[in-house]
Each structure stands twice: as C-alpha cells, then as structure tokens.
Design a protein with these regions (language model features):
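Short S/T/G/P-rich N-terminal loop/turn motif that feeds into the first structured element of a domain
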Residues: 1-72, 93-99
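C-terminal structural segments of small proteins and small subunits
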Residues: 67-68, 74-86
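Short, mixed-charge low-complexity intrinsically disordered segments
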Residues: 88-90
C-alpha cells in the first residue's frame, strides 16, 4: 500500500429510500456526486437493488479534510432539500482497507 492510499479515507453509505422518495433522491445524487472530484473524492462503487429503494455507495477522499470540505460545500448543501424531501435514511460508516 502506498502512502497516498494509506491516508485516504473511505466510507460506505447505506441508503434506504421510500418508493415515493426515489425521484428526489436520484435528483440529489445527480447534483452532488459530480462534485466529488473537486474535493479529491471518488465514487468507488454504487449499487442499487431492483426496485430502487436501497443503495450502497463506497466513496473515498484523499483526506478527512477533503471529506469535510465536500460535506460543507455550498454547492452540495444547496441541494439538501431534495435529500430531505426524499425521506431517505442514510447510514455512513467509516471503513478501513484491510487488503
């Protein structure tokens, strides 16, 4: 593992979306996921179940500071109303690479 890999921070995001909120949740994701590279972030993997009510994302950032900057970015927070309106339940888990 290189030094740059060891300093990266990785998260798993598990999302539970009510059927009525799927459209708003996807609109939110369409707005905020493209911002990741601006903050040295990367969407490693995005999975969705067949009916669209569950998603799992694996995301990484070059540093915790980059992650915090992404979370606080006005371009991202401007779309928070879509996430709220979707009524999605999110679980964000910090992870460590063990391989």
């Amino acid at each position: 593992m290189t030094a740059s890999q060891s300093s990266r921070v990785t998260f798993v995001l598990i999302v539970r979306i009510p059927v009525r909120g799927i459209e708003d949740f996807r609109a939110y994701e369409d707005a905020v996921l493209p911002l990741l590279p601006e903050f040295n972030g990367r969407l490693e993997r995005r999975l969705r179940n067949a009916d669209g009510t569950r998603e799992m994302h694996i995301v990484s950032f070059a540093s915790d500071a980059d992650f915090q900057n992404y979370r606080n970015d006005p371009g991202r927070t401007a779309h928070a109303w879509l996430l709220e309106r979707s009524s999605a339940k999110l679980e964000l888990l910090p992870m460590t690479d063990v391989s």
